[in-house]
Amino acid sequence: MSWTTPKKAIMLAAAAEGGTKLNAFDNALLKMGIGNVNLVKLSSVIPAHIEWLDELPKNIPIGMLLPTVYAHIESDEPGSTISAALGVGLSENNEGGLIYEYAGYCTKEEAEEMVRKMVEEGFKVRGWKLKEIKVISAEITVKDKPAAAVAAVVMFPY
């Protein structure tokens, strides 16, 4: 198997309910448009000169392997609010960046604040100059069905 350094990426987030916690997770992936591919979990480094997309590419093959950084949480506890967030830190001149993820029993604002702090620290310890932070999140309060919140950065080789 050969891997290619990703050239494009997109930030996505969604929350959904389902008959089980796993079905809720799957339904959130479907809402984001990535429910029929295989997500390959990555750690959190963004390649240099990546192009950020505003919408998913058309006709992604079913079963395609897509490098992805994602945060997720599922719950079946009625009344619980759950959130997932990703923070993307971009360096000066698009020379690379970092992605940090967080998911928990909290509001999306709390999750977003957590990933912002993580991005800032990640850049500081590397001695990199932070140009911009992008954040995406999803939140849901569990009602009578299991629920999931998912946030992802999906990368594409083309």
UniProtKB/Swiss-Prot annotation:
It comes from the Archaea. Its cofactor is pyruvate. SUPFAM superfamilies: Pyruvoyl-dependent histidine and arginine decarboxylases. GO terms for molecular function: arginine decarboxylase activity. The record marks S43, S44 as: Cleavage (non-hydrolytic). InterPro entries: Pyr-dep_his/arg-deCO2ase (IPR016104), Pyr-dep_his/arg-deCO2ase_sand (IPR016105), Pyruvoyl-dep_arg_deCO2ase (IPR002724). The modification Pyruvic acid (Ser) is found at S44. Pfam families: PvlArgDC. It is an enzyme of class 4 (lyase). Its EC number is 4.1.1.19. Keywords: Decarboxylase, Lyase, Pyruvate. Binds 1 pyruvoyl group covalently per subunit. GO terms for biological process: arginine catabolic process. It catalyses: L-arginine + H(+) = agmatine + CO2. PANTHER family: PYRUVOYL-DEPENDENT ARGININE DECARBOXYLASE (PTHR40438:SF1). Belongs to the PdaD family. This is Pyruvoyl-dependent arginine decarboxylase. The gene is pdaD.
